[in-house]
A protein has these predicted regions:
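Acidic, small-residue rich beta-repeat scaffolds with periodic aromatic anchors
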Residues: 25-42, 112, 124-244
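Bacterial N-terminal signal peptides that target proteins for export
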Residues: 1-11
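Extracellular-facing segments of soluble proteins and assemblies that are Gly/Ser/Thr-biased and enriched
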Residues: 93-129
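Bacterial N-terminal signal peptides
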Residues: 9-20
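Short, solvent-exposed loop/turn segments at conserved positions within beta-propeller repeat blades
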Residues: 58-64, 110-115, 204-208
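Short N-terminal edge-element motif at the start of the domain
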Residues: 37-100
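Recurrent small/Gly-Pro-centered beta-turn motifs in extracellular repeat architectures
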Residues: 54, 107-108, 193-194
Length: 244
């Protein structure tokens, strides 16, 4: 009789423990070193989610960075960039939250003069990838679908050879681009700027410096608003500037 009572108690205790501490709760391993500086930690506007950065040394005496999100109690960790190597995560990153705290952009240096963006969507107190490929790669796909890329005599297959290829976030995501005079729906649009140069080309072709486009988080589509068209025309650079 007493044995049955003890057995039932043990089962109930086990169930309670599983409920309190769910199996599979993620956290950085002991082999990771957290970047302690405040500039490497980012908190959402609603204060419920934070991003921390960790350094992992590899067997080849190299290192890769991992980016983790946590809730306000520093529980329920989630890794933003699983399976990334030094090609995509060889440097610390910058992060920007949308004003409604539902979107997160990772601003990632790839090397000297190379930069891209990643977009994450929030579910509960965790973020996961919002696009099938880096947002920066999608922006280049869009650029190469535009007539301006054909004017430069560059084709889609040439994108990997572009010199100093960069995609950056235009300042204003945190205030919904009010500083640009926009009155867009809250946290729906993200403004990006693209650049590359012709350094090293024997006969330099036109390049772009600060060419802009807008990503719609609701539809997943890119566009160029009318008020950015003039800006983009001036963003095209020629070796002989008189041709502009």
């Amino acid at each position: 009789m007493s044995g049955g009572w003890l057995g039932r108690t043990a089962i109930l205790l086990f169930v309670a423990l599983v409920t309190v501490a769910p199996a599979g709760a993620a956290s950085p391993g002991s082999e990771l070193e957290r970047l302690p500086d405040a500039e490497h930690t980012f908190t959402s506007p609603d204060g419920r989610v934070s991003v921390e950065q960790y350094l992992k040394k590899t067997a080849e005496d190299d290192h890769v960075y991992q980016f983790w999100t946590f809730d306000e109690k520093h529980q329920n960790g989630a890794l933003l960039n699983p399976n990334e190597d030094t090609d995509r995560a060889g440097y610390p990153a910058g992060f920007r939250f949308s004003r409604n705290s539902q979107w997160l952009v990772r601003m990632q240096k790839l090397g000297a003069g190379y930069h891209t963006l990643f977009l994450y969507r929030r579910t509960g107190d965790q973020f996961s990838s919002a696009t099938p490929k880096p947002l920066g790669d999608m922006a280049w796909d869009y650029f190469f679908s535009q007539p301006v890329s054909r004017m430069m005599h560059r084709k889609s297959r040439d994108r990997d050879s572009l010199n100093h290829k960069q995609v950056h976030l235009v300042q204003g995501m945190d205030d919904n681009y009010a500083g640009m005079g926009k009155h867009w729906p809250d946290s729906r649009y993200i403004v990006l700027t693209l650049s590359f140069d012709s350094q090293g080309e024997d006969k330099p072709k036109p390049w772009i410096d600060g060419w802009r486009c807008v990503f719609d988080t609701k539809t997943g589509q890119f566009s160029i608003p009318v008020d950015l068209a003039d800006h983009n025309a001036k963003a095209v650079e020629f070796r002989d500037r008189r041709r502009r």
